């Protein structure tokens, strides 16, 4: 069973840019605008299959010794931890000799565990995202989210 925890999707549009496009003044309800920006960002990520704003992601995968497993979010910037996950929820860092990681040319992340004695699941921590902030999101995507 695969589970991905990455928290709320950060807005992939700058609030000032959205206000200007929508012709909404500074007196408009900030909470409503923030909610709309978060919603459109999440929809854009689901539609494109791309993580727009860089963030840390924690993913749980089954142990499959010797098999490469793809991570669920892309583009992957870095894989920072591979841990064995015990039934009680505690994690233990696996020795680097017991696993391999790879980020391919398409920025898909991969993990292969050779040994995970006593663990039925893995917790992988990694960073994924196209841009550090909204200004780095490609123009075409930003335009699409505004429309």
Kindly give the residue locations of the regions a language model identified:
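Divalent metal-cofactor coordination and adjacent catalytic microenvironments
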Residues: 1-147
């Amino acid at each position: 069973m695969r589970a991905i925890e990455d928290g709320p999707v950060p807005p992939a549009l700058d609030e000032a840019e959205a206000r200007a496009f929508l012709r909404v003044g500074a007196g408009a309800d900030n909470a409503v605008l923030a909610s709309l920006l978060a919603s459109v960002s999440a929809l854009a990520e689901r539609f494109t299959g791309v993580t727009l704003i860089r963030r840390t992601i924690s993913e749980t995968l089954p142990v499959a010794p010797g098999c490469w497993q793809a991570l669920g979010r892309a583009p992957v910037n870095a894989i920072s931890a591979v841990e064995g996950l015990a039934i009680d929820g505690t994690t233990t860092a696996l020795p680097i000799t017991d696993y391999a990681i790879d980020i391919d040319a398409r920025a898909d992340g991969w993990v292969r565990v050779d040994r995970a004695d006593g663990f039925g699941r893995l917790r992988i921590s990694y960073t994924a995202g196209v841009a550090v902030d909204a200004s780095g999101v490609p123009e075409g995507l930003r335009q699409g989210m505004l429309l």
